[in-house]
C-alpha cells in the first residue's frame, strides 16, 4: 500500500496494476481524484513492514534510492528506523490492516494475522505499546504522546525531526519543560528537502532558544 499523493510524481501511472500483474496485492491509499474534498488532505505518512507476525520494521525510511544514498540530492541522507520482535508486532499488523481495509474490500478473518504474533512472545523486563495517528482518528494520538512525555520528563527530552511545525500548546509544553530544568534538545536538518517546511521551522527558533531549548 502506498499513499496516492506521496507517490504521485515518483511512480508511474497505474503502477498498482503493474504490481498486481506480478502477483503482488496492492492498494493506493486515498488516491488523487479531480474533485474538491477535504478527504484529499487525509494522508498516511507511516512506513510499516510486518513479516509473518514475528517481526516489524518502522521508522522514517521510505523505499527510495535516497535512503540508501544511491542518490545524493541533499548530501548524505540520515534517517531512523527500528526492528521489533514479539507480541507487540500485532500492534503494527493492526495499524496496517486498518488502512488496508479502508476500501470496500476486506481481508477475511483479520484476527488470524493479529493472533500470529502471540507465538513469538519474547520475555523481557519492559513492554512496548505501538501507537499511530491515522486520518480516521478523532483524537491526535501522536500529539498527546509528545505532550505527555514532555510534561512527565524529569531529566531530558531529545527530539529529532525533519519538519518542526508546532502549535501554541506544543510550544508551551516545550517551554515549560525547559524552564523547570529539563534538558530539551531539537535536532533539525541543515539541508532541507522541503524548503517551505524548513523556513517555517526557522520561525520558531528565536522563541525556542529564548526559552532555553537547544537546536
What do these predicted ranges mean?
Residues 1-215:
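Charged, low-complexity intrinsically disordered terminal segments
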Amino acid at each position: 500500500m502506498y499513499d496516492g499523493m506521496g507517490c504521485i510524481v515518483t511512480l508511474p501511472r497505474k503502477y498498482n496494476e503493474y504490481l498486481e500483474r506480478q502477483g503482488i496485492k496492492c492498494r493506493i491509499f486515498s488516491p488523487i481524484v479531480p474533485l474538491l474534498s477535504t478527504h484529499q488532505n487525509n494522508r498516511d505518512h507511516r512506513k510499516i513492514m510486518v513479516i509473518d507476525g514475528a517481526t516489524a520494521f518502522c521508522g522514517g525510511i521510505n523505499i527510495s534510492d535516497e535512503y540508501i544514498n544511491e542518490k545524493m540530492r541533499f548530501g548524505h541522507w540520515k534517517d531512523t528506523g527500528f526492528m521489533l520482535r514479539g507480541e507487540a508486532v500485532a500492534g503494527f499488523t493492526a495499524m496496517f490492516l486498518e488502512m488496508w481495509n479502508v476500501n470496500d474490500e476486506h481481508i477475511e478473518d483479520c484476527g488470524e494475522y493479529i493472533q500470529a504474533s502471540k507465538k513469538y512472545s519474547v520475555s523481557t523486563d519492559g513492554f512496548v505499546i505501538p501507537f499511530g495517528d491515522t486520518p480516521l482518528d478523532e483524537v491526535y494520538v501522536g500529539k498527546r504522546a509528545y505532550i505527555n512525555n514532555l510534561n512527565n520528563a524529569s531529566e531530558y527530552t531529545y527530539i529529532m525531526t525533519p519538519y518542526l511545525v508546532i502549535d501554541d500548546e506544543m510550544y508551551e509544553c516545550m517551554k515549560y519543560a525547559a524552564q523547570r530544568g529539563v534538558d530539551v534538545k531539537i535536532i533539525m536538518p541543515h539541508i532541507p528537502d522541503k524548503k517551505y517546511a524548513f523556513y517555517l521551522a526557522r520561525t520558531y527558533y528565536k522563541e525556542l532558544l529564548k526559552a532555553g531549548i537547544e537546536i
